[in-house]
Regions:
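Short, conserved catalytic/metal-binding motifs centered on acidic residues
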Residues: 31, 65-66, 80, 97, ...
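Dynamic "connector" segments at or just before major functional cores
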Residues: 1-205, 210-224, 247, 272, ...
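An anionic, glycine-rich sequence signature occurring as long contiguous blocks
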Residues: 1-14, 255-368
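Acidic, His- and aromatic-enriched active-site or binding-groove loops in soluble protein domains
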Residues: 169-176, 249-264
Length: 439
């Protein structure tokens, strides 16, 4: 492919106020208006004692401007200017400059972030009432997943930035950053939506605040129409008393990885060798005659009492998956890696294992956010960054709802695909009665 034009330094001038590059923002922000987003922002976000009085004025349209920019692909404060370019101000009223939005974000404190988090939850409920975001939630199973990620930062002035553990290429490393904690809601036939998100310092323990986050996510799922069984899934950081207690109080079931402490090790040793059953796993094949799996992975279960020395002791199922360690292919006897998780579901052990492994779906949400608004943590102020990630979560849910309305495969598409196919559509503005000739 060859370029068929030659350009001089003055040949490209973008001065047409009748052109827009993000025409798809019109239906997306119309959906936001139909679900009461601006009203929720006006009602719940109140900055009573601002440092800069003008900076805290009109938070609703300023935050709506930020959310619209994120839906169009903004990943830093300056990128919000794209909703003011060309003819965008003709399509939307109350569009604010990036500097004005940044001033508002820097007014946010911990309490204001909690206000914005309540907007996220209530708007998700409103979206579920307008769009079938969680199909079969009333009858089938609903899954709540909880996990955290570490977003790297590099500036010395970043409030809350500290060294925390993260895994890269399967190896645990220390990395400087900030650590959002997120909960998502999904069903078997839907992509996950974000029920809650909270920014924390990089060195914060993964489980801090997890019990409260899970309780809020369960309430949000119920309000969004999940009247069936709810299953809460998490990795070993969340296999603790607080999370289990929140699940039991709310009538939800749990499937949580357990840390291999001495009590768990004793339970593993007590499993009889004949109890292990091969299961579906990458590389496994199924016997065409018997239907049995020929696999390097096996599961078994045993009753287990967790938190036995506390008032929250509970007896349920300890399901263990063991996988042959690929580092020792020529060992005389198989060398196994064990992965135990604690659950009170009534699924068969092999199905419970598959359902538990589907907890990894939350990583698709993190991938969407990192490929969009969370490509950067833009501000030096912790409160501003807390507001930023919550607006990113609202934008994620809004795009997900727009994808469901668009139909076909858009309901489960990546965020970048939704922006490319739905939002970032160039268009020309013209009078409604403008005559055109057709030949």
């Amino acid at each position: 492919m060859q370029v068929s034009h030659s350009f001089a330094s003055q040949s490209a001038v973008f001065d047409d106020d009748h052109l827009v590059s993000c025409a798809g923002l019109v239906p997306v922000m119309t959906l936001a208006q139909q679900t009461g987003l601006t009203g929720l922002l006006s009602e719940k976000v109140q900055i009573v004692a601002p440092r800069i009085k003008s900076g805290a004025a009109n938070p609703s349209p300023k935050l709506a401007t930020l959310i619209a920019g994120m839906c169009a692909g903004a990943d830093c404060i300056d990128d919000i200017d794209l909703v003011r370019s060309g003819g965008m101000t003709t399509l939307f009223d109350g569009v604010y400059a990036p500097s004005t939005v940044g001033t508002l974000l820097r007014e946010f404190t911990f309490g204001h972030a909690r206000q914005l988090e309540s907007v996220l939850r209530d708007h998700l409920v409103a979206l579920c009432g307008r769009v079938d975001l969680l199909p079969d939630a009333a009858k089938g199973s609903v899954f709540i997943d909880i996990d955290s990620l570490l977003r790297p930062v590099y500036g010395r002035a970043k409030q809350g930035a500290s060294y925390g553990h993260t895994k890269i290429a399967g190896k645990q490393i220390l990395r400087k950053g900030l650590s959002p904690l997120a909960t998502t809601i999904s069903t078997a036939g839907s992509a996950p939506v974000i029920a809650g998100m909270r920014l924390r310092a990089g060195k914060t323990a993964s489980a801090k605040g997890a019990g409260r986050m899970v309780a809020q996510a369960i309430r949000t799922a119920r309000a969004a129409g999940a009247s069936g069984q709810i299953l809460v899934r998490g990795d070993s950081a969340y296999g603790n008393r607080a999370v289990v207690r929140s699940c039991l109080r709310a009538g939800a079931r749990f499937s949580l990885v357990m840390i291999r402490n001495p009590a768990v090790e004793r339970a593993l040793a007590a499993i009889d060798e004949s109890a292990w059953t091969p299961v579906s796993y990458p590389g496994a094949v199924q016997d065409p005659d018997t239907g049995a799996w020929i696999s390097d992975a096996e599961v078994a279960e045993i009753p287990y009492t967790a938190f036995a020395s506390t008032p929250d002791r509970i007896t349920a199922r300890l399901i263990v998956r063991r996988v042959k360690d690929a580092r020792f292919p020529d060992a005389l006897f198989p060398v196994w890696r064990y992965h135990p998780f604690f659950t009170n579901t009534d699924l068969p052990a092999d199905q419970a294992d598959i359902t538990h492994r589907q907890h990894a779906i939350i990583e698709t949400v993190f991938a969407d956010l990192i490929d969009g608004p969370l490509a950067h943590i833009p501000s030096g102020r912790f409160g501003a960054n807390s507001a930023w990630i919550l607006c990113a979560a609202i934008a994620h849910n809004l795009l997900r709802a727009a994808g469901v309305l668009a139909g076909e495969n858009h309901g489960r598409a990546r965020g970048s695909t939704l922006r490319r196919k739905i939002v970032n559509i160039p268009a020309r503005l013209r009078p409604a009665e403008w005559c055109t000739s057709r030949t």
